[in-house]
Structure formats: structure tokens, C-alpha cells
């Protein structure tokens, strides 16, 4: 049994959870999310608490699935009540970003501007032309979109130029040592 899944998921005020047709639906002030349930888990809703239990007939994989669905439901509850945000910073001469409608336009030191379509459930804003904020209620979509932005120009280890997550540590390498001796 998963240790985390032994604890109930406490629902904040304004968040409702329901189960319909083998799907869990979480509604809150920021929106609603759905997740298909696996047959290995049973969800119990008691008042303002949600419990995740292994199905009684399952002998194989109960702990893994129980922990997975506890985390998925917990993230859904947090997403519809508070939301998720990832912030990226662009470091480099001439690096800048802008949002034009549903397109994120990046100038990242290549010969052409890089244009990334923004998914419907994600909000993107740019501060000071170099800080990109990705917000949404679905943790997976927010993280995936932020990772796609970062993948366009990963931080390089010599000068640290590129797109990185805010407060991300980039391991730096020393450059070539200059020749100092004569033959």
C-alpha cells in the first residue's frame, strides 16, 4: 500500500468531486478536470474527503496504482482550486519573447523567429520580454508546455545562455584553457 495514499485528500471550499461512468470529475472555481479510473482502484468520497483504496479483487499492482491515482486526484484538486504555474527565464543577448493571440513568439538567436501555438487550456504571459509565465489548471499540460518552450533552446553549460526554469541550477563547465608556454 502506498504511504501517501493512506491519507485522505481533503477538499478545499468550493471544490466538488463526483464519479460517473468510471471517470472522476473534479469541479472548482478555476474550472473542471476529468480522469478515467483504472479497475485496480476504488474511490470513496466521504464528506469533504476523498479516499483511494485498492480494489478488493486485485492482487497485482495495487500499491502503485493507488499511489498514482492519489497523486492524480490531489493534483486535480489543487489545479481547480489554486492552479499551477511554471516560470521560465531567457538568458542571452537579443533573447526575447512575446505573445500574439494564441502564438508564443520567441527570438532565441536563430535566423528565424520561433513560433509556438499555445494550447487552449493554458495561459501564457511575458514579463520584461525575457520572463515567460505558463499557467493552467492541468499540471501535466502546464509542465509539458513549459518543457517544450525550454527544449527550443536549452541552457548551454559554457555561458549559461538559453531558456531555463526560474531558479534552475545550470551546471557550468570551464572553457578551453589558453596556451601559456612557448615551444
Curated annotation (Swiss-Prot):
Entry coiled-coil feature ranges: none
Any one GO MF annotation of this record: structural constituent of ribosome
GO cellular component, one term: cytosolic large ribosomal subunit
Keywords on record: Ribonucleoprotein, Ribosomal protein, RNA-binding, rRNA-binding
InterPro entries on file: Ribosomal_uL6-like, Ribosomal_uL6-like_a/b-dom_sf, Ribosomal_uL6_a/b-dom, Ribosomal_uL6_bac-type, Ribosomal_uL6_CS
Record's keyword annotation contains rRNA-binding: yes
Source organism, top-level taxon: Bacteria
GO biological process entries: cytoplasmic translation
PROSITE patterns cross-referenced by the UniProt entry: RIBOSOMAL_L6_1
Pfam families per the UniProt record, alphabetical: Ribosomal_L6
Keyword rRNA-binding applies: yes
Family of the protein in this entry: Belongs to the universal ribosomal protein uL6 family.
PANTHER family: 60S/50S RIBOSOMAL PROTEIN L6/L9, LARGE RIBOSOMAL SUBUNIT PROTEIN UL6M
Function: This protein binds to the 23S rRNA, and is important in its secondary structure. It is located near the subunit interface in the base of the L7/L12 stalk, and near the tRNA binding site of the peptidyltransferase center.
Subunit structure: Part of the 50S ribosomal subunit.
The name this protein goes by in its record: Large ribosomal subunit protein uL6
